[in-house]
C-alpha cells in the first residue's frame, strides 16, 4: 500500500516556503529531514515543492504518495545505536517542468516562498548557448532557475523583501 494523506495520520499541509530542485536521496534524507525537524520543533510551518526534471516519472511517483515517504535514521544517540523510522510529510508536491511548465512557473507566485535549494552538481551547472529565455522550459538547470527567479521578481514587482 502506498503512503498518502488519506491512510496515514500526518500534519495538515503547510504553506510552501521552499522550492527544491532535485529529488535525490541526499535532499530527501538531509534537507527535508531538517525542514521536517524545523516544522516539528521550531515552528517553521513550511513545506517543500520539488522541481524534478531528470526522471520523466519521478514527480508523478512522489505525487502518488502525496509527497510522503519514510526516512530510516541510523546512528548513535546518547552512546546507544539507534534505528528509527520517520514519515516525512513536508513535501506538498513535485513538478516536472518538462511536462507542466505552467505549474513550474506558478511556484514563483506563491506568496510564502522564501528559499530555493538544490544540490545540482558541476555536471548540471552548465552553459548551453542554445537555451533561450522563451524556451518552455529551458534545458539546463541554470536557465530554469533564471526563469523561476524572473517569474518571482515579476510576481513581487521587484520587492526584494519577498
Label each region the model flagged.
Residues 1-162:
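Non-transmembrane, aqueous-exposed alpha-helical and coiled segments at domain scale
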Amino acid at each position: 500500500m502506498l503512503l498518502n494523506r488519506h491512510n496515514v495520520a500526518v500534519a495538515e499541509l503547510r504553506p510552501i516556503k521552499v522550492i527544491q530542485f532535485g529529488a535525490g536521496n541526499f535532499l530527501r534524507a538531509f534537507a527535508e529531514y531538517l525542514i521536517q525537524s524545523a516544522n516539528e520543533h521550531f515552528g517553521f510551518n513550511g513545506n517543500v515543492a520539488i522541481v524534478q526534471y531528470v526522471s520523466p516519472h519521478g514527480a508523478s511517483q512522489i505525487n502518488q504518495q502525496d509527497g510522503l515517504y519514510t526516512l530510516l535514521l541510523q546512528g548513535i544517540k546518547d552512546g546507544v545505536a539507534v534505528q528509527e523510522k520517520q514519515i516525512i510529510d513536508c513535501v506538498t508536491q513535485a513538478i516536472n517542468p518538462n511536462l507542466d511548465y505552467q505549474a513550474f512557473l506558478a511556484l514563483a507566485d506563491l506568496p510564502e516562498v522564501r528559499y530555493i535549494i538544490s544540490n545540482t552538481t558541476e555536471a548540471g551547472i552548465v552553459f548551453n548557448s542554445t537555451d533561450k529565455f522563451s524556451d518552455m522550459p529551458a534545458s539546463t538547470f541554470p536557465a530554469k532557475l533564471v526563469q523561476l527567479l524572473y517569474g518571482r521578481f515579476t510576481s513581487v514587482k521587484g520587492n526584494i523583501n519577498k
